[in-house]
């Protein structure tokens, strides 16, 4: 089996290697000598979770909304929003694919939650969590995705959680690799929001089909209930996770009068992303309290385009 380190050595020869860390806020486009965009923009389904959960937005309209309302041709699904309809397989998944194909929209990944702790201290529970994700690997493969996003949840001390999470991820990654699907971990609370910890997990797994999905905002170190009390530096965290990144989430909440995100300096953050050699999709993930979901998506897209172009 080719390890992740061997894979990266081979990939280094074709990496763009453009450094933008020293560029000014208005200079991101200056490092691009061609007409190819520095990065492409996708839409994460979580941006529409309120509308979908209320029934105002039919789940099957996701690809249509991305393309027709925003001109976005790549999408990222969230299993919470359709697992009750599909179970991760069957006719519903086929219908999702048919609609996306008809709209000319790429399905990039499925964000998976609620399937157990991949780093559970109990071996049987950990094994069950690994197997619970198999259906999503299969659904992702059918949809034409490159990855499923998972959580590296565990319990215990720092080092023990690292070993347990790496074990569960390694097992799931072996299954993903057989289906040519990547297993990618998002900073999503607890130790997974510690960039040093999660990068350490990646080194332990050491597999080209296992990587990260850095999110600009999810760097709270506590639980969902106490988030906001202790935060990891978001810029450091993204920098630590980018060497393993196979997708990126542009989290947004609120915007100032200039159209900039209030919590995250998008110019600074995207310099970090681009300096790592990343040229893939950056997914809009709006979850703010002020703008509507549609307006929030539009504002985030406009900001990303302003940074890029």
Where are these predicted regions, by residue range?
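Conserved, mostly hydrophobic/aromatic
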Residues: 43, 66, 100, 140, ...
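C-terminal helical cap(s) of enzyme catalytic domains, especially alpha/beta-barrels
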Residues: 294-309
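N-terminal export signals
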Residues: 8-28
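Structural motif corresponding to the early beta-alpha repeats
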Residues: 72-170, 177-182, 208, 218, ...
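Twin-arginine (Tat) signal peptide motif
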Residues: 1-8
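Acidic/histidine-rich catalytic cores of soluble enzymes
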Residues: 74-75, 170-271
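C-terminal segment of N-terminal export signals and the immediately downstream linker at the start
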Residues: 23-53
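Short, acidic/polar
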Residues: 53-68, 127-138, 230-238, 266
């Amino acid at each position: 089996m080719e390890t992740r380190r061997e894979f990266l050595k081979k990939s280094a020869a074709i990496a763009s290697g453009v450094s933008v860390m020293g560029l000014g806020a208005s200079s991101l486009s200056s490092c691009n000598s061609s007409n190819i965009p520095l990065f492409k923009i996708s839409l994460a389904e979580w941006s529409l979770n309120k509308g979908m959960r209320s029934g105002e937005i039919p789940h099957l309209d996701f690809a249509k909304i991305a393309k027709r309302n925003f001109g976005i041709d790549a999408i990222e699904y969230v299993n919470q929003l359709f697992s009750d309809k599909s179970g991760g397989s069957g006719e519903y998944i086929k219908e999702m694919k048919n609609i996306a194909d008809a709209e000319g929209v790429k399905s990039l990944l499925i964000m998976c939650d609620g399937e157990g702790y991949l780093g559970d201290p109990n071996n049987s529970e950990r094994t069950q969590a690994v197997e619970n994700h198999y259906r999503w690997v299969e659904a992702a493969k059918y949809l034409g995705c490159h990855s499923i996003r998972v959580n590296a949840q565990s319990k215990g001390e720092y080092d023990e959680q690292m070993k347990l999470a790496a074990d569960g991820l390694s097992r799931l990654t072996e299954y993903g690799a057989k289906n040519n699907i990547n297993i990618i971990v998002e900073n999503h609370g607890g130790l997974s929001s510690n960039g040093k910890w999660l990068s350490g997990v990646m080194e332990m797994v050491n597999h080209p089909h296992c990587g990260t999905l850095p999110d600009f905002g999810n760097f709270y170190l506590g639980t969902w209930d106490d988030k906001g009390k202790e935060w990891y530096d978001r810029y450091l965290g993204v920098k630590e996770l980018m060497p393993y990144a196979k997708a990126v989430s542009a989290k947004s909440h609120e915007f100032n009068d200039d159209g900039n995100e209030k919590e995250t300096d998008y110019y600074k953050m995207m310099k970090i992303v681009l300096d790592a050699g990343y040229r893939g999709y950056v997914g809009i993930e709006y979850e703010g309290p002020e703008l509507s979901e549609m307006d929030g998506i539009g504002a985030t897209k406009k900001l990303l385009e302003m940074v890029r172009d």
